[in-house]
C-alpha cells in the first residue's frame, strides 16, 4: 500500500447541511491513476491545524465511474479537523491525501441480477451513497433499498442527491427515511434503527432474499442490524459493515502491563529497519511508541477502525484491543493493527512492506 501523502486542490465546497460540507478535489493528471477508487473506499487527509499535524479518514462519496473524488465532513463537537474543514477550508486550498483504501465493497459485474440493502445513520451515508451510485450504474438489473436514519429532515446529508437518484432509478431504488426527533406521517418512519424497527421493516424487506447488505454508522446500530440479520440466518459473508468512530479515540483502553520486562520492537518499512522499545511501566501500543520515538509510520484513525496502520507480525506476539479494520482471514495470516497492538513478548518484529 502506498502510504505517501499527495497534495490535492479543493475544487468545490458544497454545504450539504448546516453542519456538513462536501469537498470535491481536483486530482492532478499525474495522480489520476493513483486516486482511482472503488465504491465504499476512503481517503486519509492530513493538515496542520494550530501548528499541529492532524490526520483523519473520510469515506469517498462519489460514483467510482463518473465523478471526481469527494468526501463529506460532518462537524462534530470538539472535532479539530471537522471544525477546520467546515469553517476555515476554502476553494483553492490544498489538502494532503493518501491514496484510496478500504474494503467496504463487493465486486460488481454488469451481468449481476442482485438485490442490495443498506443501512446508514447520519454521516454513515457517505460510503453508502458511493456504493449506491456505482452499483446502480454498473448493474442495470440490480436493485437497492436504503434505510437511512437521521435526527430530522434538515440533517439529512445528500438529501438532494438521493432524491435525484430516486428519480433516475424509480423502479430500482427504494429509500426509507427514519427520523428520531421529527414526527413522520407513518409510524415506520419515526424512531431509531433497533430491533423493533427492524421487525417493522420485515413487512417491506424479505431478509433472506437479499444478496448483499451494507451497514455504516455508530457501533450500536451496526451490531444491532448485524445480529438481527444473523438471527434471520443471513450468511455472515454477505453482511458488510464500516464502523465510524471519533479520531484518536480507541473503543477500549489498555490498562494492564502485558510484559514483565522491556519489549524490543523491530519495524520494517520502505525497506528500512528501525528499533523501538516499550517499557512495561508505560505500556504503549506499537504505533504510538514508534511515533513518540521519532518514527514515521502510516496511521489515521488510531481507533482500530481503518487499516492504515496495518502490518504483518513476523516475530513475537501481541494482543490487539480491537481490530474492526481487519478481516478474519487477515488476522489468521498474521496481520495486525499497530495502533491497537501491545507486545506480550520481549522481542517483536513487524513488517509494513508485506
Stretch-by-stretch model annotation:
Residues 2-94, 98, 114, 150-152, ...:
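Ferredoxin-reductase
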Residues 39-41, 256-264, 305-307:
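A short, compositionally biased
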Residues 60, 298-308:
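Cysteine-centered iron-sulfur cluster-binding motifs in ferredoxin-type domains/subunits
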Residues 64-67, 109-114, 343-352:
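Ligand-binding loop in jelly-roll beta-barrel domains
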Residues 84-260, 264-266:
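FNR/FR-type flavoprotein reductase catalytic core
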Residues 261-298:
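C-terminal accessory/binding modules appended to enzymatic or scaffolding proteins
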Residues 291-293, 308-354:
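Iron-sulfur (Fe-S) cluster-binding segments and ferredoxin-like electron-carrier domains
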Amino acid at each position: 500500500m502506498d502510504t505517501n501523502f499527495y497534495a490535492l486542490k479543493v475544487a468545490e465546497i458544497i454545504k450539504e447541511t448546516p453542519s456538513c460540507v462536501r469537498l470535491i478535489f481536483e486530482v492532478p493528471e499525474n495522480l489520476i491513476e493513483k486516486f482511482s477508487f472503488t465504491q465504499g473506499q476512503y481517503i486519509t487527509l492530513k493538515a496542520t491545524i494550530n501548528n499541529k499535524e492532524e490526520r483523519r479518514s473520510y469515506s469517498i462519496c462519489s460514483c467510482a465511474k463518473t465523478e471526481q473524488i469527494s468526501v463529506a465532513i460532518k462537524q462534530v463537537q470538539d472535532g479539530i479537523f471537522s471544525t477546520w474543514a467546515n469553517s476555515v477550508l476554502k476553494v483553492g486550498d490544498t489538502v494532503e491525501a493518501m491514496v484510496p483504501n478500504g474494503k467496504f465493497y463487493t465486486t460488481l459485474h454488469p451481468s449481476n441480477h442482485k438485490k442490495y440493502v443498506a443501512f446508514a445513520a447520519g454521516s454513515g451515508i457517505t460510503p453508502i451513497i458511493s456504493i449506491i451510485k456505482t452499483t446502480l450504474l454498473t448493474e442495470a438489473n440490480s436493485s437497492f433499498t436504503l434505510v437511512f436514519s437521521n435526527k430530522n429532515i434538515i440533517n439529512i446529508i445528500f438529501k438532494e442527491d438521493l432524491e435525484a437518484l430516486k428519480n433516475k432509478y424509480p423502479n430500482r431504488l427504494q429509500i426509507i427515511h427514519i427520523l428520531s426527533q421529527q414526527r413522520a406521517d407513518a409510524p415506520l418512519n419515526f424512531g431509531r434503527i433497533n430491533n423493533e424497527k427492524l421487525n417493522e421493516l420485515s413487512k417491506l424487506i424479505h431478509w433472506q432474499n437479499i444478496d448483499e447488505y451494507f451497514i455504516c454508522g455508530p457501533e450500536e446500530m451496526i451490531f444491532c442490524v448485524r445480529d438481527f440479520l444473523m438471527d434471520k440466518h443471513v450468511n455472515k459473508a454477505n453482511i458488510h459493515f464500516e464502523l465510524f468512530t471519533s479520531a484518536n479515540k480507541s473503543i477500549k483502553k489498555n490498562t494492564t502491563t502485558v510484559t514483565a520486562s522491556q519489549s524490543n520492537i523491530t519495524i520494517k518499512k520502505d525497506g528500512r529497519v528501525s528499533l523501538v522499545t516499550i517499557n512495561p511501566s508505560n505500556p504503549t501500543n506499537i504505533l504510538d511508541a514508534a511515533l513518540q520515538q521519532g518514527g514515521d509510520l502510516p496511521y489515521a484513525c488510531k481507533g482500530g477502525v481503518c487499516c492504515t496502520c496495518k502490518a504483518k507480525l513476523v516475530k513475537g506476539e501481541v494482543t490487539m484491543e480491537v481490530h474492526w479494520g481487519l478481516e478474519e482471514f487477515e488476522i489468521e495470516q498474521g496481520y495486525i493493527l499497530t495502533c491497537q497492538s501491545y507486545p506480550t513478548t520481549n522481542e517483536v518484529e513487524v513488517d509494513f512492506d508485506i
